[in-house]
C-alpha cells in the first residue's frame, strides 16, 4: 500500500480509532527507546503510564477543540463575516484590502445585524441608523448580542432568537447606568477603606511618619523607585504634574505622614499599603480584605474607562482565576445564599466576582447610614430600569441565561445594601 493510500485510509478512521492507533505506535517506539537506554522494568511501566495519561489528555483536548470549532461553524453559518465585501478588493487569503474585516457603513452594519436574525420592529432602521451614527458605535452596541440565544436548527440556523435592535439599545443603556452606579460605589469604598486604615493607625498609636518609612523600606528596589518616581512626577511642574494633589505631595515628599500618603496614593498602590498594614499588625481579616479591595479596584478601572460590563454576564464570560474570598462566601452563607451549583457558577464569572466584592465592601467599609442609603437608592433605580424590560428579556429559566446573572446581582444588593437601610 502506498503512503497516499495509507493516509487516505487513516482519514476514514474515527477520532477515537485514530487516537488509539497513533498511541499504540508511539507506545512501541517509546518502549523500545527506554529499553535501549537501560531503563528498569518498573521505571518503564511508570514512564508508559505517564505517557498514557499525557496522550489521553491530548486526545480530550483535541476533542474539545473540535467540538468548539464545530459550534463556531454552526453559529457563523448565517453570518456574512467570512464573506468578502464584493465592493472591495480581496486576495486569495480572503482578506479585504489587507484586513480580515473591513469597516462597514451604517447601512452595512444594519444589513449585517439583519443577516444574523436581529429585527428592527421596535426601532426602525432609520432610527437605528441615527443611533449608530450619533449615540453609540456598532462594536459596542452589537456586543450585547452574545447574551441572547441562537437558532440551532432549521432554515435560520445560527440566527438570534427574538432579538430586536431595541434590546441592544436597552442593554447598552442599562450597562451605562451600571457603570455609573458601580463607579460611585467604588469611589466610596476607596475613601472609607482609607479612613479605616487611618483610624486603625490612631488606635494602635502608630507614628504617622515611621509607618510610612517602614512601608517604603520593605518595598523592593524597583517597587520603591516606581512609587517615589510616580509621586515626584505628580509633584513636579512638568507634564505629569497633578494639579489637584501635586502641591500637597511636593510639600511632604521628603517626610510624608500616613494621612498625606493615604491622600496621595491611588487605589492600586493603596491596596499594597493595606496589605503592609495587615502584615504589620498580623491581622488576617485585613489580609483577606486586601484581596477584596483589589477586585474592587479592577472594577473601578473598568467603570472609569467606560468598559462594557453586562455583555460578559454569561457562562461564557471570563472566569475568575481565584476562589471566592472567604469573607464573601461566609457572608453569603450567613444570609442564606449557600454554596449551591448556581452560586458557584455565578461567582466563577470574573465580572460577577468583582461586583460581589464591591457590594460586600460597601457593607463592610461604608458604615454611615446616609452613605448606604444613598447607594441603596441608586441600585434600586438600576434594578427598576432592568425590570422594566423584563418581559423582553425573559425569565431565569428561559434561554437568555444572562437574566439569572442579573437576578443574582440583585440578591447581593439586597443582602449587602438594601437590608442596611
Labelled PLM ranges:
Residues 3, 46-48, 52, 56-298, ...:
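Extended intrinsically disordered or low-complexity regions, especially N/C-terminal cytosolic tails and loops
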Residues 306:
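Acidic/aromatic/glycine-rich contiguous surface patches that form carbohydrate-binding/processing clefts
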Residues 2-70:
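Modules that initiate DNA replication and primer synthesis
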Amino acid at each position: 500500500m502506498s503512503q497516499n493510500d495509507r493516509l487516505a485510509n487513516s482519514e476514514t478512521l474515527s477520532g477515537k480509532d485514530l487516537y488509539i492507533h497513533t498511541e499504540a505506535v508511539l507506545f512501541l517506539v517509546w518502549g523500545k527507546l527506554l529499553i535501549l537506554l537501560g531503563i528498569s522494568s518498573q521505571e518503564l511501566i511508570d514512564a508508559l503510564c505517564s505517557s498514557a495519561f499525557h496522550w489521553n489528555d491530548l486526545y480530550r483536548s483535541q476533542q474539545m477543540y473540535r467540538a468548539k470549532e464545530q459550534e463556531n461553524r454552526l453559529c457563523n453559518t448565517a453570518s456574512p463575516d467570512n464573506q468578502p465585501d464584493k465592493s472591495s478588493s480581496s486576495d486569495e487569503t480572503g482578506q479585504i484590502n489587507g484586513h480580515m474585516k473591513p469597516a462597514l457603513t451604517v447601512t452595512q452594519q444594519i444589513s449585517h445585524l439583519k443577516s444574523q436574525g436581529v429585527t428592527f420592529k421596535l426601532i426602525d432602521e432609520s432610527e437605528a441608523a441615527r443611533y449608530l451614527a450619533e449615540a453609540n458605535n456598532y462594536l459596542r452596541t452589537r456586543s450585547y448580542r452574545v447574551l441572547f440565544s441562537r437558532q440551532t436548527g432549521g432554515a435560520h440556523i445560527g440566527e438570534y432568537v427574538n432579538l430586536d435592535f431595541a434590546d441592544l439599545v436597552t442593554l447598552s443603556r442599562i450597562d451605562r447606568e451600571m457603570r455609573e452606579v458601580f463607579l460611585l460605589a467604588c469611589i466610596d469604598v476607596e475613601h472609607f477603606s482609607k479612613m479605616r486604615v487611618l483610624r486603625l493607625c490612631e488606635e494602635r498609636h502608630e507614628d504617622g511618619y515611621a509607618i510610612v518609612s517602614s512601608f517604603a523600606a520593605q518595598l523592593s528596589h524597583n517597587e520603591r523607585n516606581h512609587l517615589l518616581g510616580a509621586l515626584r512626577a505628580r509633584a513636579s511642574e512638568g507634564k505629569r504634574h497633578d494639579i489637584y494633589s501635586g502641591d500637597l505631595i511636593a510639600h511632604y515628599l521628603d517626610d510624608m505622614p500616613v494621612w498625606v500618603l493615604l491622600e496621595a496614593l491611588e487605589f492600586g498602590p493603596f491596596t499594597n499599603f493595606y496589605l503592609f498594614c495587615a502584615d504589620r499588625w498580623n491581622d488576617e481579616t485585613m489580609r483577606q480584605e486586601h484581596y477584596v479591595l483589589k477586585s474592587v479596584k479592577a472594577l473601578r478601572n473598568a467603570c472609569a474607562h467606560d468598559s462594557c460590563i453586562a455583555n460578559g454576564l454569561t457562562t461564557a464570560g471570563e472566569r475568575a482565576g481565584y476562589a471566592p474570598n472567604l469573607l464573601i462566601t461566609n457572608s453569603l452563607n450567613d444570609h442564606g445564599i449557600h454554596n449551591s451549583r448556581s452560586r458557584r457558577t455565578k461567582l466563577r464569572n470574573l465580572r460577577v466576582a468583582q461586583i460581589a466584592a464591591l457590594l460586600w465592601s460597601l457593607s463592610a467599609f461604608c458604615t454611615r447610614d446616609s452613605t448606604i442609603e444613598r447607594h441603596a437608592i441608586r441600585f434600586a433605580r438600576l434594578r427598576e430600569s432592568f425590570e422594566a424590560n423584563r418581559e423582553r428579556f425573559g425569565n431565569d429559566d428561559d434561554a437568555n441565561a444572562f437574566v439569572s446573572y442579573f437576578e443574582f446581582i440583585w440578591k447581593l444588593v439586597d443582602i449587602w445594601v438594601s437590608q442596611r437601610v
